[in-house]
Amino acid sequence: MLSFYYGEECPHCHHMMPIVDKLIGEGKEINKLETWHNEENAGKLEKADGGRCGGVPFFHNTDTDQFICGAANESRIRDWADGRKSE
């Protein structure tokens, strides 16, 4: 499962949203979970993060346990979504 955790007012998250939406449009199933105004999603983020990053944006691929802390370029996000390790 692919999850993108974000905050509604987070500028870095807003920068990532077009890339995430593009991948969704191409058929990737990515769960978008707002965490700043949704306590349930905030709890999911805390569990998924496990103290590795401590904030948003946070990308987690549960199939590979790969994660990205913070903003990243499209190539890195694609690698994450495809389960490939990025350089």
Please identify what each model-predicted range represents.
Residues 10-13, 53, 69:
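Disulfide-bonded cysteines in secreted/extracellular proteins and peptides
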Residues 33-35, 70:
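Conserved beta-strand termini and adjacent loop/short-helix elements that scaffold enzyme active sites
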Residues 46-62:
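Structural micro-motif
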Residues 1-31:
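Local sequence-structure signature of Cys/Sec-based thiol-disulfide redox active-site neighborhoods
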Residues 58-87:
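Non-catalytic, surface beta->alpha helical segment in thiol-disulfide oxidoreductase systems
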Residues 21, 25-28, 50, 82, ...:
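Sec-exported extracytoplasmic/periplasmic mature domains
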Residues 35-46:
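Structural microenvironment flanking redox-active thiols in thiol-disulfide oxidoreductases
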Residues 16-19, 41, 73, 77:
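Stable alpha-helical elements in mature extracytoplasmic
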